[in-house]
């Protein structure tokens, strides 16, 4: 950056964080004690920087989305989870205008063109759950756009096939092998062509609450990934909220109370 020559907007455009490693280390059971602080952004205007100048509170916003797994099905054990088709880079800041003025309260996506999207099973983030649900505070990801339901079999990069999703591996009571289910980030209560896909928004929490498992999944993770057009034997409820607006949430499997 050049003093007096680099505009704020130009500087903001260079503030991109890339995932390295691709799985965000959150000091979870799979991170071997590693932890990478989550970048946050906030700003406030002051008349000048001086000892006597009081600086007001600064509202900070996390640049990542968090995904938690809950399971209320007594005869089903979640063994492992894969985060698939995720972006591996993101802007540090929420959206800004041509003058570099940031709208910290904006709910709009702010995704760099060079987002290093990781598509498919091979680069997927692996999480060993081993029945320890709820599985919380371990899965983080950069912002990503909602899938586009073309309803025409178009499997381009923005379609349902390559949308951010989870592959959940588990067993029902009595089963001797792990099977896999695809879980998409969709609006609860709608089916077929009316399904609404949700984006992954910064500073938001997404709780995947498994409510029913009526049959086995696929014996292969790739088959599960390709099952985006097939009704799943795993039913879930997706709860999502902005962590700035709702601090504490209680969920009993049917109703949610947020404060």
Model-predicted regions and their roles:
Residues 1-6, 57, 66-204, 209-212, ...:
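Tryptophan-paired
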Residues 10-62, 70-72, 191-258:
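Extracellular beta-sheet/turn segments enriched in Thr/Pro/Gly and aliphatic residues
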């Amino acid at each position: 950056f050049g003093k007096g020559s680099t505009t704020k907007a130009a500087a903001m455009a260079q503030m991109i964080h890339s995932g390295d490693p691709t799985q965000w280390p959150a000091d979870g059971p799979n991170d071997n004690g590693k932890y990478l602080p989550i970048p946050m952004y906030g700003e406030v205007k002051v008349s000048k920087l001086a000892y006597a100048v009081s600086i007001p509170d600064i509202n900070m916003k996390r640049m990542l989305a968090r995904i938690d797994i809950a399971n209320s099905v007594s005869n089903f054990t979640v063994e492992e989870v894969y985060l698939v088709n995720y972006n591996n880079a993101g802007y540090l800041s929420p959206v800004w205008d041509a003058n570099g003025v940031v709208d910290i309260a904006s709910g709009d996506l702010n995704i760099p063109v060079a987002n290093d999207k990781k598509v498919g099973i091979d680069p997927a983030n692996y999480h060993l759950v081993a029945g320890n649900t709820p599985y919380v505070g371990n899965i983080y990801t950069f912002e990503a756009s909602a899938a586009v339901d073309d309803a025409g079999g178009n499997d381009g990069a923005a379609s349902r096939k390559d949308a951010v999703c989870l592959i959940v591996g588990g067993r029902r009571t009595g089963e001797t092998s792990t099977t896999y289910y695809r879980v998409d980030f969709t609006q609860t209560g709608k089916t077929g062509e009316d399904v609404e896909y949700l984006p992954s928004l910064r500073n938001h929490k997404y709780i995947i609450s498994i409510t029913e498992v009526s049959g086995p999944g696929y014996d292969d993770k790739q088959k599960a990934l390709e099952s985006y057009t097939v009704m799943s034997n795993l039913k879930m409820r997706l709860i999502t909220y902005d962590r700035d607006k709702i601090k504490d949430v209680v969920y009993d499997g049917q109703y949610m109370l947020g404060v």
